[in-house]
Amino acid sequence: MKTAVYVNVKNEKRIVEFIKYYTHIGIEYFIILDDDSTENVKDVLIKNNINSLVYDVIYTNGRKFLHGIYNSKELWDKELIPLLNKNNIDYLLYVDADEFLHTGAFKNMSNLINYYEPFDSLKINVLHFGSNNIIENNTDGVIMPFNKSATKLSDFVKCLTKVSAICTDKNNGFTPNPHVLNVHNGISKNILNTIVESTVRLTEKIQLPYDKVPIYIAHYMCQDITTYIERKICSKIFLQVSQKYKLTD
């Protein structure tokens, strides 16, 4: 059984921590989509001695994807699925670079998957972490500095998906978004190991507190107050202004 992570990055400061963390819990391969980062993400990984055999980088190179990066059937059919098959990947976890799978009592990904099988899509709830009132994070990581989270799990989920079940047929409800991937009439489960009706629903309500569930996705949504303002607020303002005055294509 072989597992992989797919992640989109653009000037992610702490991609090395991300790779090392997921390698530690048993992820064997990474597909990284570099969305025109200022510094080539491959150069960052090489400088930090990350084994080049465990990842492949896809570059947007200014390409405009039909319906955007998340909804590009062409990207999945021509680049992502072939890479997954070439590397004999059985299960794919699609997350953002600030999201870390908390595996709880499971020793590694194999143990986790063995517990939940059979499934085609495992919907894992997100737990949001805050800023810890840190103005600027000068460390190389987010896991240690930011230890204050919400008390309740978010209803939103990310999915661990069986590669052979991924459906890229738009006529059958292809939904290549960062939350769920559509599967071929498959079995979808929640983190309580219960079968759920919808394979494409973006939310699953879990009533238990976060420390009473087997697994969750830790989302470090505010890596410090300065970065949050720059990336979440200023970037949106710039986009709105540039679109209004046609400053960008």
Predicted regions and their residues:
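Short beta-strand/loop segment that forms part of the nucleotide-sugar
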Residues: 28-36, 56-60
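Structural recognition of the beta-strand scaffold that forms the well-ordered cores
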Residues: 4-7, 31-32, 54, 123
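Short acidic/polar active-site loop segments enriched in Thr and Asp
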Residues: 28-29, 90, 120
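Active-site-proximal specificity loops/subdomain of glycosyltransferases
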Residues: 42-94
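N-proximal low-complexity "stem/linker" segments adjacent to membrane-targeting elements
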Residues: 1-23
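The conserved acidic donor/metal-binding loop of glycosyltransferases
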Residues: 96-100
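Catalytic-site signature of metal-activated, phosphate-bearing donor transferases
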Residues: 69-74, 103-249
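A generic secondary-structure signal
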Residues: 21, 78-83, 112-115
